[in-house]
Design a protein with these regions (language model features):
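Conserved acyl-donor/pantetheine-binding loop and adjacent beta-alpha core of acyl/acetyltransferases
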Residues: 65, 69-103, 110, 120
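Helix-loop element at the rim of GNAT/NAT acetyltransferase active sites that forms part
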Residues: 16, 27-40
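Conserved GNAT acetyl-CoA-binding A-motif
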Residues: 98, 119, 126-133
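Active-site rim helix/loop that mediates acceptor-substrate recognition in acyltransferases
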Residues: 34-62, 71-80, 84-90
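Short acidic N-proximal helix/loop "leader" segments that mark the beginning
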Residues: 1-7
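Hydrophobic adenine-recognition pocket in adenosine-nucleotide-binding enzymes
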Residues: 17, 103-105
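Conserved G/P- and acidic residue-centered "switch" motifs that form tight phosphate/ATP-binding loops
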Residues: 113
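A short beta-loop-alpha structural element at the N-terminal edge
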Residues: 11-25
């Protein structure tokens, strides 16, 4: 298990994405991935609509802009297949497995442990989710 990173939590707010942040997420995706791999608005919006609780963002407290995000879908399937990336209807809120679909950190926010902290926060949230179900 990771340790709580106080410095990162002072610099960034970790929370679930809001619907009004879809455009920001799509822009970050376009920066972090080549065009043939980047998730488009057409596929990102349904992910956020279907599983906002599985879309964690890190927001820079000074600029109030998204710096990074991690997202996934829940399922009872055991293997990640290509259709998860293009069909958010694969999400099953009662699913016992989480398929991680993207981890994006803007270049200017890299190399300070932000991706690791997103993964740790995501893991904690999903452990709580499991306990509630």
């Amino acid at each position: 298990m990771g340790q709580y990173n106080k410095e990162l939590h002072e610099k960034y707010e970790f929370r679930n994405i809001r619907r009004d942040e879809i455009e920001q997420a799509v822009k970050i995706e376009a920066i972090c991935f080549p065009p043939n791999e980047a998730c488009t608005y057409e596929h990102m919006a349904p992910r956020i609509e279907n599983a906002p609780d599985l879309f964690l963002v890190a927001v820079d407290r000074k600029t109030r802009k998204m710096a990074a995000f991690l997202n996934g879908l829940a399922t009872n399937r055991e293997h990640l297949t290509d259709d998860f990336f293009t069909d958010a209807d694969q999400h099953d809120p009662a699913g016992t497995n989480i398929m991680l679909l993207g981890l994006d950190v803007l270049p200017e926010h890299q190399h300070q442990g932000l991706a690791r902290e997103l993964m740790e926060q995501y893991r904690k949230e999903n452990r709580l989710r499991e306990e509630r179900s």
